[in-house]
């Protein structure tokens, strides 16, 4: 890891995709179980 100040594009895409997927899954499961209405 010599380039610490520069973040590779694939890492940003992976982290962004996992974050979006996780939020989507939590939202779907929350609304399915009835907890999504409290949000």
Swiss-Prot record:
Keywords: Chloroplast, Membrane, Photosynthesis, Photosystem II, Plastid, Reaction center, Thylakoid, Transmembrane, Transmembrane helix
Subcellular location: Plastid, Chloroplast thylakoid membrane
GO CC terms in record: chloroplast thylakoid membrane; photosystem II reaction center
Bilayer topology annotation: Single-pass membrane protein
Chain ranges passing through the membrane: 9-29
Family in the record: Belongs to the PsbJ family.
Function comment: One of the components of the core complex of photosystem II (PSII). PSII is a light-driven water:plastoquinone oxidoreductase that uses light energy to abstract electrons from H(2)O, generating O(2) and a proton gradient subsequently used for ATP formation. It consists of a core antenna complex that captures photons, and an electron transfer chain that converts photonic excitation into a charge separation.
Protein's UniProt name: Photosystem II reaction center protein J
